[in-house]
Amino acid sequence: KELGLSENVHTFSVSMMDNSFDEAPYQRIMSSYARSIHHEIKVSAGDVVDSLFSTVAHLDEPTGDGAAVPSFILAREAKKYVKVLLSGEGGDEVFNAYETHRAYKARRLYRKYFPKAARSLISALAHALPVSHRKLSLDFVAKRFAEGCELEHDAAAHIYWRYTLTEEQKKSLLRFPAPAVDTDRLFIDAYDKMPYPDGLNRISQLDMRYYFIDDLMVKNDRSIMAHSIETRFPYMDDAVVKFAATIPPEVRLKGLFGGRYIEKQALKPFLPAKIFNRTNMGLEMPHSSWFFGGFKDLFMKYFTKEQVERSGILNYDAVKTLVWEHKAQRKDNGRALWCVLNFILWFDLFVYDGNYKDYLVRE
């Protein structure tokens, strides 16, 4: 914008057809401010269903990432205008913008100043809240935070706040004995071996090593390259990462709500106030509400006993429990059901039917 070149730049964003998941109003503010050529891609449940099989075929492995299909849809539109996209992935890890990073600091204060009896009362009140399918709803945040705070290890709490399935749910879903070592134990061991004295640096590294590298980069590369578009990650520039590593963790995350503090202060002169002052929000689908709406036909077809048990891996009774809890709004199992659905589709495309090539994008 400062060089007068922004009017030749194309920007792309996804608009979710659910207000609590939709960032479109802020995206319009930013694109208008930058004077870019903006493309807003509206994504409905029907759009996701139409692109789901192709996305699974290109990802090549089961995934529970709720942004994979929207990214695939965005890239299909971007293909009409550009060959390379710049992605903001990595900024949350480098500058501590995740809600779980703020929760890490809040947990320490919470356990320090609230005795066990008070925490038990707060947890009971949190679990009395009605289930909502809105993004980061009050009941979801309160329940997950209260439960994670009772775990003794920092890494165990961090992974608990990130989980899709609990250890008990994972074991019940399998038709054979689960691995001897729980997932959280693996992350605790990795956390304990990290050469950093500060816990915030350690959980940042956990996210970088296992979430960013094994999920976000894979999702971006495969879903976007499906349309022959390269994705670049400016936040992963060697100089940026090395600089961020020199910033004390208490400055990167200022107080409990100051994620990306240094980055935001540096960019303040170049950002509209409404963008500067808002909190972080990740791209995700409202699958929790869509499962009995726009996903209903897909759900009815692939959650039968025959489909669920076809792989010889999933236990139908456990899946049925997830469905019942979600439908009765006892729990928000939307992310868990999305993972199960993706596994079933992947198994059909790559193993049972073996017809994944029929869904690959042809230039």
Model-derived regions, located:
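Flexible loop/turn segments at secondary-structure boundaries
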Residues: 18-22, 47-49, 93-95, 233, ...
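Active-site adenylate/phosphate-handling loop in enzymes that bind or generate adenylated species
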Residues: 72-133, 217-240
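Short, polar/flexible loop-turn hinges at active-site or ligand-entry regions and domain interfaces
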Residues: 39, 60-64, 109-114, 250-254
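A conserved beta-strand->alpha-helix junction
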Residues: 3, 8-10, 17-58, 178-186
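Adenosyl-5′-phosphate
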Residues: 36, 67, 80, 84-86, ...
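Short secondary-structure boundary/capping segments
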Residues: 29, 55-56, 99-106, 357-358
